[in-house]
Amino acid sequence: EGQPTIDAVADNVTETTRGTVLSKNGVKVSTVEHGMAALYALGIDNCLIQVNGPEFPILDGSAQYYVQEIERVGTVEQNAVKDFYIIKSKIEFRDETTGSSIMLGRKRK
């Protein structure tokens, strides 16, 4: 209690130069991408992670240790409705400033 909370949503991503930085109300935490990758790989979409510093530990540069620790401590199934978004047609998003783009389409076989 009394500790700032930063939601891991795209609107809170403020930097991606040397790692992903999440910021909110003047508070920021960096190198969250390895922890986020572990959560995604394990199908976890709702959790609270407490960080005691300005960044997530980089460890070996992968999500492996995060996955191992999450599996070690376990997870709790929540009794809540989960929203799903189904993309029915091809979508392309392009950021003209960075030149990056995201294209969603059919699965490749």
Q: What positions do the PLM features span?
A:
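Short acidic-hydrophobic catalytic motif
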Residues: E1-K109
